[in-house]
């Protein structure tokens, strides 16, 4: 079925719909499978919230929070400002969402189809804002709380955003963006204009003539007036998710109300198979579609509960699992490796208890087989690998339970099809041959007014930019992102394959392999390695003889101490002698360090030669104390590639 907008749109503001790609550039959508035949008219906010309340009741827990700063919520009885309830029932959530939808369509003047920017840390309040935008028939543009003013300005310009709901603590950059005509509603500060305060909601209801004076204050949340969701078409635009823009102008990925339900009815329903008593948690923010699906859409669709909070670090993640009885966890491979290390260090209260976990999803980057095996050996749990894309909204290749094979992403999620194609994006390749991954299913890429649509969608298929191999048993094995392939002297080297081999070495904690321009070979492979703490390598130094950016810190410190009159040694030494001695000591220390780094690099070379073909072995090693990552732990290889292009030894001629 090739679905294009046909039903009458509920949008008054038709900008998003008007700026979809031409229909002949759309991917072919598959909507004939089990559970994917949706009615022409549906509102995903009503389906996720109102229909769930009807099925499971209003008293079930929907969201939990814990560890966030107190959310001011004035008590009309005594004026105190207590912390928010730690558990939001489905009834409380619906009352909050309906009240906020009334604020949006009342005092803020939002009409169906308007784009509403959402900004703030992961919290029940931010999720309530998203649901309110859905029920109001508007279009959610959820951004990261860490994005800066220039990024926000660009997103608002591309999506023509004129309304925003923003956590008060995240408002600074949005104000600095100076978006013309932007109407911002703040929440979380408890002031008279807090859009989530009960009295703000009450006043809007009174203006609408829905209640007598004081009636809302006297009614419990479950009995407050309902906001009837806008009667949107299934193919009305629900959200625009912007890519990170690391390669230039960010791309706005447009998804419909139907798409939101489709990802829940495929990956979640068929792979995760959630239960109403599940507790979901994870590290991805709601500004990423990985987080939106895993922490809002999937649990609500199943009538389950989600922990919506912000935290970082392996110990904190384990405490969250232990304290809240988390059963479904979403995070990146790096986080699972860090948790494995933390599990060996008991908490202050004793050994870690993560026995509540039953589903662990890994996505965002390649899951090394070594990480899978280590997690399974330590916990008995089989990590669920998956690949998704902002263009596809969520995961489309995966496997669960006995179908899982370490080192293999898996099969197309039921409802999707996948194949491997040549660089032209069209010609199918046989099993066992590396090529570009092409996929189609109930959702697909539709960029907002962007000529790059023709690059991503070829012949009705979404060509993701990932290099994969389809094996004879039908499983798909990740090779590399297309831009992670290193071409050296005519050989193709997949950086992730070399990284996975490096991670099998006991002295390697993290690794990333990228290309460096080279006149003779085109590129050479360079391994950036974070050694284990007990390795005889010092952070931030290059093993090819070049000191890293911090390699001279000790000498600088010595010079500072000399200037302060604290140089050690013979008090009869003159100042010049002391300086010379300190610098000689620093040179000797650097020489010793470089020797140890060279030994470690040689050890890793020998190890890799036993694991991989010789041409795949990196020709240079750079040792560092950390690799660049996003807030969710995803490796930023593009930063390493930029550093290699600027490296003194880089020779592109």
Sequence positions of predicted segments:
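Conserved structural elements of the adenylate-forming
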Residues: 94-102, 234-239, 253-275, 283, ...
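Conserved beta-loop-beta connector loops within the AMP-binding
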Residues: 419-438, 471-473, 595-601, 636
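Conserved AMP-binding/adenylate-forming
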Residues: 83-88, 101-147, 285, 492, ...
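AMP-binding/adenylate-forming catalytic core of the ANL superfamily
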Residues: 147-150, 164-166, 329, 441, ...
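Gly/Ser/Thr-rich phosphate-binding loop
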Residues: 326-331, 342-405, 417
């Amino acid at each position: 079925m090739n679905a294009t907008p046909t039903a009458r749109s509920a949008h008054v503001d038709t900008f998003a719909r008007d700026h979809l790609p031409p229909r002949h550039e759309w991917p072919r959508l598959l909507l004939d499978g089990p559970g994917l035949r949706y009615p022409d008219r549906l509102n995903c906010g009503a389906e996720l919230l109102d229909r769930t309340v009807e099925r499971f009741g209003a008293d079930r827990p929907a969201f939990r929070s814990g560890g966030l700063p107190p959310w001011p919520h004035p008590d009309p009885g005594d004026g105190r400002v207590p912390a928010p309830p730690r558990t939001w029932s489905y009834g409380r959530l619906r009352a909050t969402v309906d009240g906020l939808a009334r604020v949006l369509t009342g005092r803020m003047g939002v009409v169906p189809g308007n784009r509403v920017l959402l900004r703030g840390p992961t919290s029940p309040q931010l999720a309530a804002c998203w649901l309110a935008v859905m029920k109001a028939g508007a279009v959610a543009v959820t951004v990261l709380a860490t994005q800066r003013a220039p990024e926000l300005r660009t997103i608002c310009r591309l999506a023509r955003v004129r309304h925003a709901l923003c956590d008060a603590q995240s408002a600074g950059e949005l104000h600095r963006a100076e978006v013309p005509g932007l109407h911002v509603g703040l929440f979380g500060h408890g002031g008279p204009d807090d859009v989530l305060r009960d009295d703000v909601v009450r006043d809007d209801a009174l203006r609408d003539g829905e209640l007598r004076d004081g009636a809302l204050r006297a009614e419990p949340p479950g009995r407050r007036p309902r906001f009837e969701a806008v009667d949107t078409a299934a193919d009305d635009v629900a959200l625009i998710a912007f890519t990170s823009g690391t390669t230039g102008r960010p791309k706005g990925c447009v998804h419909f109300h139907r798409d939101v339900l489709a990802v829940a009815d495929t990956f979640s329903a068929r792979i995760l198979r959630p239960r109403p008593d599940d507790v979901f948690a994870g590290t991805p923010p709601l500004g990423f579609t990985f987080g939106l699906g895993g922490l809002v859409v999937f649990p609500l669709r199943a009538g389950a509960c989600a922990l919506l909070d912000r935290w970082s670090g392996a110990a904190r993640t384990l405490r969250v699992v232990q304290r809240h009885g988390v059963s479904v966890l979403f995070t990146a491979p790096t986080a699972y490796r860090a948790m494995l290390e933390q599990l060996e260090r008991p908490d202050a209260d004793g050994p870690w208890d993560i026995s509540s976990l039953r589903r662990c999803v890994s996505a965002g980057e390649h899951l090394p087989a070594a990480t899978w095996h280590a997690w399974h050996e330590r916990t008995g749990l089989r990590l669920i690998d998956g690949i998704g894309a902002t263009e596809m909204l969520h995961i489309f290749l995966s496997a669960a339970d006995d179908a899982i094979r370490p080192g293999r992403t898996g099969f197309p999620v039921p409802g999707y099809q996948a194949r491997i194609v040549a660089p032209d994006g069209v010609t199918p390749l046989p099993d066992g041959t590396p090529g570009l991954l092409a996929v189609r299913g109930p959702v697909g890429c539709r960029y907002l007014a962007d000529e790059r649509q023709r690059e991503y969608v070829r012949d009705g298929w979404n060509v993701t930019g990932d290099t994969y191999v389809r094996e004879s048993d039908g499983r798909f094995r990740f090779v590399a992102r297309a831009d992670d392939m290193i071409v050296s002297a005519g050989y193709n080297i997949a950086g992730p394959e070399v990284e996975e081999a490096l991670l099998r070495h006991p002295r390697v904690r993290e690794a990333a392999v990228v290309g460096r321009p080279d006149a003779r070979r085109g590129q050479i492979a360079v391994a950036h390695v974070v050694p284990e703490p007990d390795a005889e390598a010092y952070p931030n130094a290059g093993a090819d003889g070049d000191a890293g950016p911090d390699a001279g810190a000790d000498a600088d410190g010595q010079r500072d101490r000399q200037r302060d009159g604290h140089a050690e040694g013979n008090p009869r030494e003159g100042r010049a002698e002391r300086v010379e001695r300190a610098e000689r000591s620093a040179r000797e220390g650097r020489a010793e360090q470089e020797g140890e780094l060279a030994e470690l690099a040689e050890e890793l070379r020998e190890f890799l030669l036993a694991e991989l073909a010789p041409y795949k072995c990196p020709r240079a090693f750079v040792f560092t104390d950390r690799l660049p990552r996003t807030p969710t732990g995803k490796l930023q290889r593009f930063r390493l590639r930029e550093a290699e292009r600027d490296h003194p030894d880089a020779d592109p001629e």
